């Protein structure tokens, strides 16, 4: 089991990063709520990971804190929720916000998450509500709002929009939906990470 990695960030392409560890490069997918907290390119990062082995691939999912990883591990145990949907859910809501939605049985907000319909939202409520009681509650104390990492300003608005649309598609949105979300909030001074963050928040 690979549970923690420490290395230099070589590439950032939401929701992916390329992490260099002693000359070896590792592709890691992160939920956007964690991606926002990454340091700049060329800087060192510590990533808490969940390793998934499939017949056709070995995949690493990364998180800023063990609390996100713990929540992801519980999410993918839910019937019909795989790693891709688990990543999308934690991109649309932080772990704390997700727990709050479960405790309040807030289906209306859950169904706004990419890939989550009414049946999936109801299943999440039934299967997750008891599971979160078994998690260490100290992991889920309120934390400060996630901060966006600054990025180079030489990216054009169009390339930022294209990158944001690509990231939303990776998180489960249909291409037309992703394009419309970005179109609705696009501004020349917004980088790709800001566009993604605003787009996800606009669905809640």
Curated annotation (Swiss-Prot):
Record bears the keyword DNA-binding: yes
Keywords: Cytoplasm, DNA damage, DNA recombination, DNA repair, DNA-binding
Chain segments carrying region Domain I: 1-64
Annotated segments matching region Flexible linker: 144-155
GO terms (BP aspect): DNA recombination; DNA repair
Region annotation (Domain II) ranges: 65-143
Coiled-coil intervals, chain numbering: none
Main location, first listed in the record: cytoplasm
Keyword DNA damage: yes
Region span, Domain III: 156-204
Origin: domain of life: Bacteria
GO terms of molecular function: ATP binding; four-way junction DNA binding; four-way junction helicase activity
Cell compartments where the protein resides: Cytoplasm
GO cellular component: cytoplasm; Holliday junction helicase complex; Holliday junction resolvase complex
Domain free text: Has three domains with a flexible linker between the domains II and III and assumes an 'L' shape. Domain III is highly mobile and contacts RuvB.
Record note on quaternary structure: Homotetramer. Forms an RuvA(8)-RuvB(12)-Holliday junction (HJ) complex. HJ DNA is sandwiched between 2 RuvA tetramers; dsDNA enters through RuvA and exits via RuvB. An RuvB hexamer assembles on each DNA strand where it exits the tetramer. Each RuvB hexamer is contacted by two RuvA subunits (via domain III) on 2 adjacent RuvB subunits; this complex drives branch migration. In the full resolvosome a probable DNA-RuvA(4)-RuvB(12)-RuvC(2) complex forms which resolves the HJ.
Similarity remark: Belongs to the RuvA family.
Function: The RuvA-RuvB-RuvC complex processes Holliday junction (HJ) DNA during genetic recombination and DNA repair, while the RuvA-RuvB complex plays an important role in the rescue of blocked DNA replication forks via replication fork reversal (RFR). RuvA specifically binds to HJ cruciform DNA, conferring on it an open structure. The RuvB hexamer acts as an ATP-dependent pump, pulling dsDNA into and through the RuvAB complex. HJ branch migration allows RuvC to scan DNA until it finds its consensus sequence, where it cleaves and resolves the cruciform DNA.
Protein name: Holliday junction branch migration complex subunit RuvA
Lineage: Bacteria, Pseudomonadati, Pseudomonadota, Gammaproteobacteria, Enterobacterales
Gene label: ruvA
